[in-house]
Amino acid sequence: MSKVTVNIQYCGAWGYGKYAKALSSSIASYFGDGVVDVTFEKDSGATGNFEVTMNGTLIHSKTKDGKGRCESDKEKAGVMEQIEAYLESL
């Protein structure tokens, strides 16, 4: 059973799905199977969103914080660090 649920909300009109899938793969590779459950929420229309929540808490936001689509190692590391910190607190 997963200890963490991460939801990736992404813009459906600008092809952000590939970035959401890439982040999901990175999370699975980093934490292994069954630790993090990743879900996807595709926006209908052009929203520009790439929002990542962990158990309902926003941890990465392209729209609100001006961050990107988790393409860079730095942005991916930021997401991983927050998930890891949560897991260590359990």
Where are these regions (language model features)?
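Short strand-turn-strand beta-turns centered on an Asx-Gly dipeptide
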Residues: 55-57
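Short, thiol/selenol-centered motifs that function as redox-active sites or metal-ligating centers
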Residues: 1-31, 46-49, 69, 73, ...
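Non-catalytic, surface beta->alpha helical segment in thiol-disulfide oxidoreductase systems
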Residues: 59-90
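Hydrophobic beta-strand residues in large extracellular and virion-surface proteins
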Residues: 6-8, 38, 79, 83
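Thiol-based oxidoreductase modules, predominantly thioredoxin-like and allied folds used
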Residues: 33-46
